[in-house]
Amino acid sequence: MLKFLITLYLAFFSLSATAADLAREKRLADEIVDMIVEGEPVWLKADNHYFLSIYTPTPQHHPRGAVIILHGRGMHPDWADVAAPLRTALPASGWHTLSIQLPVLEKEAKYNDYVPLFAEAGPRISAAIAYLRDTGVRHIVLVAHSCGAHMAMHWVARHGDRDISAYVGIGMGATDYKQPMKEAFPLAKMHVPVLDIYGSAEYPQVLNMAPERLAAMRKASNPQSRQIVVPGADHYFHEHNGELVKAVAEWLDQLKL
């Protein structure tokens, strides 16, 4: 009996230790929701939890589709680097954007701490897709940065890429010191076009994995897939967000969907 109780306690402790920090997520939402200038807040539901998303429509009369943006580790859908520049700029190229809040942990959490949360992101991605489908969007592109890319790849590995028209991975493969990736990216099995984009001043793990990612994309054999390096950019594209937006927009513009 004692052994059973100890096992039950450890299981509960493990579950609670890896559950998303909903209180911190709420604080992030409270901080930004009234500060949104471009776009509008949309509350989507997944796993009986409402999470913040920011929808920014294109002004063009004939939209090309919509882009779902997944931010990096511990951030929010209007983060100053990567997320906000993409969500506010891509509408000018004919794309609606929907930047969603991903599960977060405390600020000090590392890659290994976030691995159990990858599965929690899946229902949010699916909810975002369902929302866009309900508005009549046909082509949906998933754009994911850093930890968001890990979460996106976890979802693709289990769900497939049938519900998206293309995928953009930004700074893919980032982890922490002596914390190797727990899950391989399913790039070789993807059917949709893939853009792998990263900066030349990236984290070592992202740079070291670049040839492996390119080989996997070539194995998938989609002629529209590309790997692009932004000179001088670090993992967060600080002071290089303009180049990031330009590269992503140009790649999206040439897609034959």
Q: What is each stretch, according to the model?
A:
Residues P77-W79, K107-K110, M151-M153, D176-P180, ...:
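Extracytoplasmic/secreted cell-surface and envelope-processing proteins
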Residues F4-F13:
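Sec-dependent N-terminal signal peptides
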Residues V42, N48-L52, P57-R133:
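Serine-hydrolase catalytic machinery in alpha/beta-hydrolase-like enzymes
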Residues A20-Q60:
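N-terminal cap/lid segment of alpha/beta-hydrolase-fold proteins
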Residues A166, G171-V229, D234:
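The feature captures the conserved acid-bearing segment of alpha/beta-hydrolase catalytic domains
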Residues Y131-M190:
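Primarily recognizes the serine-hydrolase "nucleophile elbow" in alpha/beta-hydrolase
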Residues N222-L257:
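C-terminal catalytic histidine-bearing segment of alpha/beta-hydrolase fold enzymes
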Residues S14-T18:
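N-terminal signal peptide c-region/cleavage motif recognized by signal peptidases
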